[in-house]
């Protein structure tokens, strides 16, 4: 246990000098020593070594507020990386990046600690899955189905409904799914974390969820490592042979925290000011979120898209790692269609006739073709009006508008705002409904009948009321 002294402090980045023969290793945790001159600093402040600068000096990131730090303060090396409690004692609890409880419910009842930096599973341990995970959300089950043990990204700009969609997925999957879940709140609003906690508590599934938060108000060091803390807890359950759900809200803030400290660590910024190690940092996290022969991790990640630009380096780097991408569109949200999922932009590796079956595949592709045709005709309609279209095109537009409305659905988590009860639509019902639409069996119904309903039978009932 060597002792060093702070030699420089710039924001969240702190340089600490140790004796040359006792330099801490990269990723080792260091702790601020209690002393009279440390009274203004955060008690027991932890640092993580990022670089060895030579001559006994290491460059670290403070995992907490660096207010009150000054040169000469004593810092002790722990000789090991940051370790957090794992196992069943973490269920039903809210923790911070270091695994300390923040829910005022006493200490975490777990004796087992695990380092947050782990190697990704070896290639021969991996176990890809082709089993589908039913979500009960029509547009997702039809166009971009999820795989058990797969990785899903919810992409969207500010205010198009990423968190609401994620909450609905948690509601539909975590409550129906008897397994365990881990939720990592990375740089998001504290209110959302609070809502999530109460949502879980009210539905009596709190004892199956472990929650880790490093929210918007936390220093960048916390936001940079909190995703790894949550993942370490999920990995422990997976290695026990369980099927785990791992929710991350929001993966973009993980990148952003890295960007905030990157320049202070002396790295040259790359495109759009991101850190030059963007792809490597993302890969380190994503390669660990995987299913092995022992157990599986199904991960659902919200990804903020800066200025609605999907080519921004951060979302573009995240795309590469995912099995399904659910793209939320501002144009669809503007039409009042929620969930605002873009069925033409969203993709899934599972949408393959050998995985989902021929019927599902053909219905999904026909729905996309109809919507694509409508998209192409929209300019003509705007300039010349509907009358100039051929009868086939008029029919395609009419069906596309019905499909567009039928892709909307009332959510359980939004009942308080909409006043209409949430709907869970089984996959078979979803396929049956859209097959009837593209086959022309609903051509006589008004398009309002399809807005905010669950199954196709509800649309028929609504049409009767409208007449």
From Swiss-Prot:
Single annotated GO MF: ATP binding
Record keywords: ATP synthesis, ATP-binding, Cell inner membrane, Cell membrane, CF(1), Hydrogen ion transport, Ion transport, Membrane, Nucleotide-binding, Translocase, Transport
Residues reported to bind ATP: 156-163
CDD domains cross-referenced by the UniProt entry: ATP-synt_F1_beta_C, ATP-synt_F1_beta_N, F1-ATPase_beta_CD
Name of the protein described by the UniProt record: ATP synthase subunit beta
Source species: Cupriavidus taiwanensis (strain DSM 17343 / BCRC 17206 / CCUG 44338 / CIP 107171 / LMG 19424 / R1)
HAMAP family hit by this protein: ATP_synth_beta_bact
One Gene Ontology CC term in the entry: proton-transporting ATP synthase complex
Originating gene: atpD
Annotated PROSITE patterns: ATPASE_ALPHA_BETA
Assembly mode: F-type ATPases have 2 components, CF(1) - the catalytic core - and CF(0) - the membrane proton channel. CF(1) has five subunits: alpha(3), beta(3), gamma(1), delta(1), epsilon(1). CF(0) has three main subunits: a(1), b(2) and c(9-12). The alpha and beta chains form an alternating ring which encloses part of the gamma chain. CF(1) is attached to CF(0) by a central stalk formed by the gamma and epsilon chains, while a peripheral stalk is formed by the delta and b chains.
Chief location: membrane
Record's subcellular location: Cell inner membrane
């Amino acid at each position: 246990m060597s002792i060093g002294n702070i030699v420089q402090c710039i924001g969240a980045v702190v340089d600490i000098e140790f004796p040359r023969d006792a330099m801490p290793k990269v990723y080792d945790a260091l702790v601020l020593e209690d002393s009279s001159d440390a009274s203004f600093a955060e008690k027991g402040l932890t640092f993580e070594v990022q670089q060895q600068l030579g001559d006994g000096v290491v460059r670290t990131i403070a995992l907490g507020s660096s207010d009150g730090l000054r040169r000469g303060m004593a810092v002790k090396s722990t000789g090991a990386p940051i370790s957090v409690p794992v196992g069943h004692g973490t269920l039903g609890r809210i923790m911070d990046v270091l695994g300390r409880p923040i829910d005022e419910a006493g200490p975490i009842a777990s004796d087992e600690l695990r380092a947050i930096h782990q190697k990704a599973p070896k290639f021969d341990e991996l176990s890809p899955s082709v089993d589908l995970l039913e979500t009960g959300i029509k547009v997702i089950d039809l166009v971009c189905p999820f795989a058990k043990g797969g990785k899903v990204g919810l992409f969207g700009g500010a205010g198009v409904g990423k968190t609401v969609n994620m909450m609905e997925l948690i509601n539909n999957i975590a409550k129906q799914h008897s397994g365990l879940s881990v939720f990592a709140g990375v740089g998001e609003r504290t209110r959302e974390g609070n809502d999530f906690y109460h949502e879980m508590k009210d539905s009596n599934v709190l004892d199956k969820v472990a929650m880790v938060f490093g929210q918007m108000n936390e220093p960048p060091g916390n936001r940079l490592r909190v995703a790894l803390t949550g993942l370490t807890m999920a990995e422990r359950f997976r290695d026990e042979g369980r099927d785990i759900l791992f929710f991350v809200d929001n993966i973009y803030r993980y990148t952003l925290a890295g960007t905030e400290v990157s320049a202070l660590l002396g790295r040259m910024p790359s495109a759009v000011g991101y850190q030059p190690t963007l792809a490597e940092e993302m890969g380190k996290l994503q390669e660990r979120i995987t299913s092995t022969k022992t157990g599986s991790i199904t991960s659902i990640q919200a990804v903020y898209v800066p200025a609605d630009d999907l080519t921004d380096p951060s979302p573009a780097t995240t795309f590469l790692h995912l099995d399904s991408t659910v793209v939320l569109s501002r144009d669809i949200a503007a039409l009042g269609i929620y969930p605002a999922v873009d069925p033409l932009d969203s993709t899934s590796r599972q949408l393959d006739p050998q995985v989902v079956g021929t019927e599902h595949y053909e219905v999904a592709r026909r729905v996309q073709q109809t919507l694509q045709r409508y998209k192409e005709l929209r300019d003509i309609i705007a300039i010349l009006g509907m009358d100039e279209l051929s009868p086939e095109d008029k029919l395609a537009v009419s069906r596309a508008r019905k499909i567009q409305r039928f892709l909307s659905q009332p959510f359980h988590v939004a009942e308080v705002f909409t006043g209409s009860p949430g709907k869970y639509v089984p996959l078979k019902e979803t396929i049956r409904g859209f097959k009837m639409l593209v086959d022309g069996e609903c051509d006589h119904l008004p398009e309002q009948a399809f807005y905010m309903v669950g199954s196709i039978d509800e649309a028929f009932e609504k049409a009767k009321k409208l007449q």
